[in-house]
């Protein structure tokens, strides 16, 4: 009987930080070795960070990554390590290095290269053509990368039919809401269908607009979960795999005897690479695998936003942020996220009232700042607003007050926030949500200014849900109740309400999900029971405001289809359908 201990290290690399990433990887290898692991796996492109985008077009970047791999190989004595890197042949490959006892024994090249959503693998990499399995004593295991395991056939099936008892998949799988459950079910199915133990290791951390959730998983040969890593945290998880159980399961599962696969048609060749002929059992205490708990949807999204904000700010060299508080839900939620991400002392909030700012907004903004313990300033902009109106009065003569005058206030606020940013080196966090940016209910060069739009991909109804979550988890509510219950308003004119300009958010968010995330047609949305005039207004307004969204700060992806990396539409476009 052979029992093999597998460790999965979900690390948080920094893009292009070869020294730092290499040190992280070596620390994980050393820790796994000290806990008696036979194999430790690290995520896809762990050496470079993911996704490197056009850094992959720089030969010197590829060379630096290979140099880092050499250092990792030398540090991997007494263990087998699987590490994601960029391999160079006549082309470049998204690759996994299989290192055994300080020697690079083999390399796997990713076969399925995704070219949808946020993925551009085909832009850079050449697909692999082999599906190697690795012999470790009497244990055979296969290695593949991320997308390779999302298909029922492909490398996983080829490797299993060639004798692999264990499949190790290294991934950089970006987060979106509810993806974790879908991914877990898929992986359990792969393990059960192929009668293999399956280990999946994922990146954790933020990279620009993407967040990686970790959530590494290990399943037994029946598809039962035996270990799960923490979500949105670095972690190192272990499991002991008994390959005799895999053999017994296969004896009792006649499906494998009937399976056939045309390897040539798949473009893959199965080959065996020997790591060691003999396995020497290690003396070690039995290990108990940890199964981290699943989170509620609200907690999951909130933690994704916290991690994405923390990493975006810190990895880009900032320590502090500044936020304009309006007394509304959006800026309140962003302030809570920022305080959790960076610490209250690193978050500066500013309230900038005019004649249209209500007493309730002033009260609630101050209460929120006090509850969070963040530095808080009030900078009145009424006099500046008056000066703008006076300066423009000759040019505006004969016209009525309207959107132009309203937006002057937002742009004054934007200027003040940017001045504070320049003076104190703090990153401005913009506070717009997905519903408003979808239909352009925001001011270009005003409330849109900033270095990161934290809730850019969060629909308005989800904003409210997250605010309730923030208050539920606290001994005392952090967000004043009136901020949540009052009708939303930009407060740029007398008695202004969002619903004066927009459909109710319950309707708007539903139509936006159908149009933006599902690409449903106008006719299909009307057939769902939505008012034709409202549907046509939403579609037209979304399309017309593409130019605004192109100029917005990046934001953290949490839905299945975010603006920017996911949804790529032309600005100049007259098609409505």
Locate each region found by the language model.
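Enzyme catalytic cores with a strong preference for nitrogen-chemistry domains
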Residues: 1-324, 340
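ATP/NTP-dependent adenylation/nucleotidyl-transfer catalytic domains that generate, transfer
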Residues: 195, 221, 245-326, 331-577
């Amino acid at each position: 009987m052979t029992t093999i201990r597998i460790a999965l290290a979900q690390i948080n690399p920094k893009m292009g930080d070869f020294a730092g990433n290499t040190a992280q990887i070596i620390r994980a290898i050393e820790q796994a070795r000290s806990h008696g692991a036979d194999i430790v796996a690290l995520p896809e492109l762990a050496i470079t960070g993911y996704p490197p985008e056009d850094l992959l077009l720089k030969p010197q970047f590829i060379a630096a990554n290979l140099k880092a791999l050499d250092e990792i190989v030398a540090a991997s004595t007494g263990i087998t390590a699987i590490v994601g890197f960029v391999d160079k042949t006549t082309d470049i490959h998204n690759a996994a290095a299989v290192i055994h006892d300080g020697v690079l024994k083999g390399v796997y090249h990713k076969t399925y290269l995704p070219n949808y959503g946020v993925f551009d693998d085909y832009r850079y990499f050449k697909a692999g053509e082999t599906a190697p399995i690795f012999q470790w004593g009497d244990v055979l295991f296969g290695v593949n990368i991320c997308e390779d395991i999302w298909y029922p056939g492909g490398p996983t099936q080829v490797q299993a039919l060639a004798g692999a008892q264990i499949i190790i998949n290294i991934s950089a799988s970006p987060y979106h809401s509810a993806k974790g459950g879908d991914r877990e079910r898929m992986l359990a199915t792969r393990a059960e269908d192929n009668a293999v133990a399956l280990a999946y290791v994922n990146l954790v951390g933020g990279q620009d607009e993407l967040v990686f959730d970790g959530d590494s998983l290990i399943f037994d040969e029946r598809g039962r979960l035996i270990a799960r890593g923490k979500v949105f945290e670095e972690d190192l998880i272990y499991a002991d795999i008994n390959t005799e159980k895999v053999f017994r399961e296969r004896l009792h599962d006649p499906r494998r005897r009937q399976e056939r696969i045309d390897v040539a048609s798949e473009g893959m060749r199965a080959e065996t690479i020997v790591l060691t002929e003999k396995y020497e059992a290690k003396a070690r205490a039995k290990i108990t695998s940890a199964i981290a708990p699943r989170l509620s949807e609200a907690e999951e999204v909130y933690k994704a936003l916290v991690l994405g904000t923390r990493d975006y700010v810190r990895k880009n060299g900032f320590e502090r942020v500044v936020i304009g508080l309006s007394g509304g839900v959006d800026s309140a939620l962003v302030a809570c996220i920022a305080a959790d991400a960076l610490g209250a002392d690193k978050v500066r909030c500013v309230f900038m009232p005019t004649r249209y700012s209500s007493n309730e907004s002033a009260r609630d903004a101050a209460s929120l700042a006090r509850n969070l313990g963040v530095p808080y300033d009030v900078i009145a902009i009424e006099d500046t607003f008056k000066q703008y109106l006076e300066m423009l009065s000759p040019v505006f003569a004969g016209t009525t007050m309207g959107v132009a005058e309203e937006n002057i206030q937002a742009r004054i606020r934007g200027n003040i926030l940017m001045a504070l940013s320049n003076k104190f080196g703090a990153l401005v966090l913009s506070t717009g949500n997905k519903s408003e940016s979808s239909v352009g209910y925001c001011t270009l060069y005003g409330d849109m200014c900033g270095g990161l739009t934290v809730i850019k991909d969060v629909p308005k109804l989800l904003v409210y849900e997250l605010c309730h979550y923030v208050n539920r988890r606290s001994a005392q509510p952090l967000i004043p109740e009136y901020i949540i219950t009052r009708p939303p308003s930009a407060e740029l004119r007398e008695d202004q309400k969002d619903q004066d300009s927009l459909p109710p958010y319950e309707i708007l968010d539903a139509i936006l999900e159908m149009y933006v995330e599902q690409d449903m047609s106008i006719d299909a949305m009307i057939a769902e029971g939505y008012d034709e005039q409202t549907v046509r207004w939403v579609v037209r307004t979304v399309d017309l405001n593409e130019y605004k969204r192109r100029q917005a700060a990046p934001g953290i992806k949490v839905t299945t289809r975010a603006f920017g990396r996911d949804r790529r539409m032309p600005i100049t476009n007259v098609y409505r359908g």
